[in-house]
A protein has these predicted regions:
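C-terminal extensions of enzymes
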Residues: 1-20, 26-33, 41-42, 146-152, ...
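Non-catalytic, usually N-terminal nucleic-acid engagement modules in DNA/RNA processing proteins
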Residues: 1-182, 296-298
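Short secondary-structure capping/turn micro-motifs that flank functional sites
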Residues: 65, 150-151, 225-226, 278-279, ...
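Structural signal for hydrophobic packing residues in well-ordered secondary-structure cores
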Residues: 138, 169, 173-176, 180, ...
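A non-catalytic, amphipathic alpha-helix used as a structural packing/dimerization or gating element
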Residues: 129, 133-136, 160, 164-171, ...
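Glycine-rich phosphate/ribose-binding loops and adjacent secondary-structure elements
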Residues: 163-166, 179, 184-305
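Conserved, mostly hydrophobic/aromatic
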Residues: 24, 57, 92, 134, ...
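Glycine- and acidic
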Residues: 151-155, 159, 216-222, 330-333
Length: 375
């Protein structure tokens, strides 16, 4: 994997670039739809390609490990062979999911024991077997296995957690270097910067990660309940240290406003379940504001969902989508999910254009003001 930094904004830290993988190029800034179990919920890959224009999707190591399981994925030739997606894939390490299993997990220096949320069976994730698992899944970008401490952890817990995450990172890198890709395409490993909301821990973590010389770096443990201004401050602290010639990935974030603010602070890659989750709940982001498609006000509105959006936005009226939600039709959630994902991809594409034009900061300010409206 390579990263070419193309443009840097004169008035902010926003930048554009191109990530090149064996499965294709990714223009940054980029939003990555989340395909937890190897699929993006409610959206066919053909729609992801043509309507959403997704350049890369995510897979979830925890969920894929449990179901369908590694034997099936390996027999299919990796996740690309199993699900038929021919563009880049990134897999998280499963750490966030495992550490969300409060009460059914046990943490130690070795790794994390946990019970499956499916059948209660017992498993363990270690830095070594997570690297092996991600090799079998075969994603173009693999994430290191880290501990994800609760967002409001006290300083001592956060420090202890970070120290273990750093030891685990060394083990991940060692295992990664000892193993080879299984399916004929290269894979890259991204370390993750943790440290909760403590500046000194974030700086320490960023320096530790930067020194590893990885192909790209991630920022984790944010958007977990802290005020947004604190999140932005942590991004600034970390990006002052992370190398400028490598892509920076902010994990699990977030709203359109969050994404634009993070782009301004030098972040290149994003993922979040919000587009599909909010879409399934009838809440639609647009450049004019947020619409609740269950509201009666749309009952007789025959204008397009978004006249400047993807093809489905243009041919579907607000009244029709309102009707589908009120009738409980699955098509409503599908249309809304496609709209949302296409909107997120359009947002980062427009951000890229304005960074190149040199007016990103002004454009962002006007867009954020509109995005906050309820219509």
């Amino acid at each position: 994997m390579t990263f070419e930094l193309q443009h840097t904004d004169n008035a902010s830290d926003a930048r554009t670039g191109i990530i090149t993988t064996d499965h294709g190029q990714i223009k940054t800034p980029i939003f990555m739809p989340v395909g937890t179990v190897g699929s993006v919920k409610g959206v066919h890959f053909e729609e992801l390609r043509k309507q959403v224009k997704a350049q890369i999707i995510l897979g979830n190591t925890y969920h894929l490990y449990l179901r369908p399981g590694l034997d099936i994925i390996k027999a299919a030739g990796g996740l690309h062979g199993f699900n038929g997606w021919d563009r880049p894939i990134l897999t998280d390490s499963g750490g966030f999911q495992v550490f969300s299993l409060t009460g059914i997990r046990k943490l130690s220096e070795e790794g994390c024991e946990f019970r499956s949320h499916i059948d209660g069976s017992k498993h363990i994730f270690t830095p070594e077997n997570v690297m092996d698992t991600e090799r079998i899944i075969g994603a173009d970008i693999m994430m290191a296995f880290d501990e994800c401490p609760p967002g409001q952890s006290d300083y001592q817990y956060a420090k202890k957690s970070l120290e273990m995450t750093q030891r685990w990172l060394d083990r991940c890198i060692k295992r990664f270097n000892e193993t080879e890709p299984l399916y004929g395409h290269n894979q890259s490993l991204f370390p993750i910067v943790q440290g909760c909301t403590y500046k000194d821990l974030r700086r320490e973590a960023a320096k530790f990660v930067a020194d590893k010389g990885a192909d790209g770096n991630a920022i984790g443990g944010l958007a977990v309940g802290e005020p947004t201004e604190v999140m932005y401050e942590m991004i600034e602290v970390v990006n002052e240290i992370l190398p400028k010639d490598k892509p920076r990935y902010l994990m699990g974030v977030g709203t359109p406003q969050n994404i634009l603010e993070a782009i301004e602070r030098g972040v290149d890659m994003f993922d979040c379940v919000m587009p599909t989750r909010n879409g399934r709940n009838a809440m639609l982001f647009t450049y004019n504001g947020t619409m609740n498609m269950k509201n009666k006000k749309w009952e007789n509105d025959f204008s397009p969902i978004d006249p400047d959006g993807c093809d489905i936005d243009v041919i579907t009226s607000k009244a029709y989508l309102h009707h589908l939600f009120k009738a409980g039709e699955l098509l409503a959630m599908q249309i809304a999910s496609i709209h949302h994902l296409a909107f997120y991809l359009r947002l980062v594409t427009d951000a890229r254009t304005h960074i190149e034009q040199g007016d990103f900061v002004q454009w962002k300010a006007s867009v954020i003001e509109q995005l906050g409206r309820r219509i």
